[in-house]
């Protein structure tokens, strides 16, 4: 005997159906409904399904666009981080040339050596950039204004890029939630259509 619970399951609500396959199925489904709508028996179904289709794939496109922008912002931020790492490494010679390696001034810049900067990550890079800028500002008279201004510009650029990246990540997350909700709508619409068509052609 057939398990009647299968009738109440939404067979479109599965990760095994990709977005592309969902799109193709919905398009073919709409084409066939339209081709067989000579007596307008499928008009309401076509209208509802078209609305669900448009809403869903509009959301997908929006999510893709925002994700692409987020990825671009991430590249920008990573480039700034890499530029700072190179900057801190290159300026070590100038700091060492003006202060001995055991001096308090040198330790302000490189308390754990140059490798600390080379091994920096997103968890500590802003702290290191802030520290380097503060030290360059304190010793500007000896090391020159350019080191201080370059360190400040890198710190400012990083903060702007990081803020923009995090904001876009938040937008992408919110858009994913919207897309998921919209996919539920078209999944339900397609399953409802299956039941309606079945009820129209019993036997």
Regions found by a protein language model. Name each.
Residues 1-203:
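Basic/polar low-complexity intrinsically disordered segments
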């Amino acid at each position: 005997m057939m398990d009647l619970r299968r009738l109440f399951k939404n067979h479109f609500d599965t990760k095994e159906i990709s977005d592309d396959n969902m799109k193709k199925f919905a398009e073919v489904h709409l084409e066939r409904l339209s081709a067989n709508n000579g007596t307008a028996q499928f008009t309401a179904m076509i209208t509802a399904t078209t609305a669900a289709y448009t809403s869903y794939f509009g959301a997908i496109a929006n999510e893709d666009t925002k994700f692409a922008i987020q990825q671009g912002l991430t590249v920008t931020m990573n480039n700034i981080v890499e530029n700072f790492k190179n900057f801190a490494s290159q300026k070590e010679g100038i700091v060492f040339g003006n202060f001995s390696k055991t001096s308090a001034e040198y330790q302000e810049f490189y308390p754990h050596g140059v490798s600390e900067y080379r091994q920096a990550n997103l968890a500590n890079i802003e702290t290191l950039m802030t520290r380097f800028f503060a030290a360059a500002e304190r010793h500007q008279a000896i090391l020159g204004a350019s080191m201080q201004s370059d360190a400040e510009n890198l710190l400012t650029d990083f903060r702007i890029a990081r803020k923009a990246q995090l904001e876009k990540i938040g937008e992408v997350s919110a858009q994913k939630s919207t897309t998921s909700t919209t996919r539920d709508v078209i999944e339900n619409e397609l399953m409802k259509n299956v039941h309606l068509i079945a009820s129209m052609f019993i036997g």
